[in-house]
């Protein structure tokens, strides 16, 4: 018996991926997906999410069907992100702007977003531009990520008017060298590196794979899409990265309406709030995003007495 794949129940109300994937329809659009169908203990067919190629094919179908993206590919060894959870961040950012601008979510290119660490997949600029028409500047310290993201943009007429990517030449900086004196951004966003070392990152990936599949021979294949070092880790881990981001953000206090970043570890929220108080942030918000049994969150801060678009 074929079963629709249930997507996490508590995605944002505007998330197009709430409910179930139509497995039959997905396989019709991408016949190769059918080779990754598996039978669960209940005798139902489902997709093998422990197979990286299955996730890649699923993303390609979803991006084409819902976000007008005809070409999307990532190099071997780079992060392959799940679409539903990534677009949730975009929708909650839209809510933040709606609250800021008197209840109306702003759409169009006048909303300018800076995505820190956009990656080879360019996923946040894709989802944000196609969901709300926002314009994006994506940055990354990895030349191949910038090159691949640029290829994705050039290969899709739907993306070219909305997205630019830029190499962050200084690997020790976040905003410095990217935000120019005359630049204004409505938002910055970031999915920061979580781990303090590549060893810890790979161990975390291995645990995740073990939960998805009992086939330990699958581990090497899955790690092909586990992510590069710059995507997964940095010295000091997430907390050090975000403290640096907060410190740097003060230098651009009048050029950005809202600085934001995902925060993977809830224990990091308190020290981040303390850091924001030290640098004089006028407004600080922690916004929770419930996705099934998992609760993620992002922190947002502004130095403007009354945050507004520029």
From Swiss-Prot:
One of its GO terms (biological process) is rRNA base methylation. The keyword Phosphoprotein does not apply. Pfam families: Methyltransf_10. The keyword Chloroplast does not apply. It comes from the Bacteria. Its main location: cytoplasm. Keywords: Cytoplasm, Methyltransferase, rRNA processing, S-adenosyl-L-methionine, Transferase. One of its GO terms (molecular function) is 23S rRNA (adenine(1618)-N(6))-methyltransferase activity. Its EC number is 2.1.1.181. Disulfide bonds: none annotated. One of its GO terms (cellular component) is cytoplasm. It is found in: Cytoplasm. It catalyses: adenosine(1618) in 23S rRNA + S-adenosyl-L-methionine = N(6)-methyladenosine(1618) in 23S rRNA + S-adenosyl-L-homocysteine + H(+). InterPro entries: METTL16/RlmF, rRNA_lsu_MeTfrase_F, SAM-dependent_MTases_sf. PANTHER family: RNA N6-ADENOSINE-METHYLTRANSFERASE METTL16, SAM-DEPENDENT METHYLTRANSFERASE. Belongs to the methyltransferase superfamily. METTL16/RlmF family. Specifically methylates the adenine in position 1618 of 23S rRNA. This is Ribosomal RNA large subunit methyltransferase F. It comes from Psychromonas ingrahamii (strain DSM 17664 / CCUG 51855 / 37). The gene is rlmF.
């Amino acid at each position: 018996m074929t079963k629709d794949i249930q997507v996490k129940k508590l995605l944002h109300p505007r998330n197009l991926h709430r409910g179930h994937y139509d497995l039959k329809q997905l396989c019709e659009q991408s016949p190769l997906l059918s080779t990754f169908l598996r039978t669960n203990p209940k005798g139902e067919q489902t997709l093998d999410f422990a197979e990286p190629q299955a996730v890649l094919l699923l993303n390609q179908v979803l991006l084409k069907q819902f976000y007008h993206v005809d070409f999307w590919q990532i190099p071997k060894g780079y992060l392959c992100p799940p679409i539903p959870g990534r677009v949730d961040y975009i929708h909650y950012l839209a809510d933040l702007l709606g609250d800021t601008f008197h209840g109306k979510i702003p759409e169009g290119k006048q909303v300018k977003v800076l995505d820190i660490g956009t990656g080879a997949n360019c996923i946040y600029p894709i989802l944000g531009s196609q969901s709300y028409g926002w314009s994006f500047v994506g940055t990354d310290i990895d030349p191949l990520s910038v090159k691949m993201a640029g290829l994705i943009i050039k290969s899709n007429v739907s993306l070219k008017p909305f997205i630019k990517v830029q190499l962050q030449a200084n690997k020790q900086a976040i905003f410095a060298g990217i935000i120019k004196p005359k630049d204004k951004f409505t938002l910055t966003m970031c999915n920061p590196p979580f781990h303090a070392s590549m060893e810890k990152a790979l161990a975390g990936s291995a645990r995740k794979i073990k939960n998805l599949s009992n086939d330990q021979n699958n581990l090497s294949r899955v790690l092909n899409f586990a992510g590069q070092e710059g995507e997964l880790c940095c010295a000091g881990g997430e907390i050090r990265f975000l403290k640096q981001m907060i410190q740097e953000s003060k230098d651009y206090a009048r050029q950005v309406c809202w600085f934001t970043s995902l925060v993977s570890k809830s224990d990091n929220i308190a020290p981040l709030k303390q850091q924001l108080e030290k640098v004089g942030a006028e407004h600080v918000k922690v916004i929770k995003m419930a996705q099934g049994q998992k609760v993620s969150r992002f922190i947002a801060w502004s130095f403007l007495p009354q945050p507004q678009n520029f």
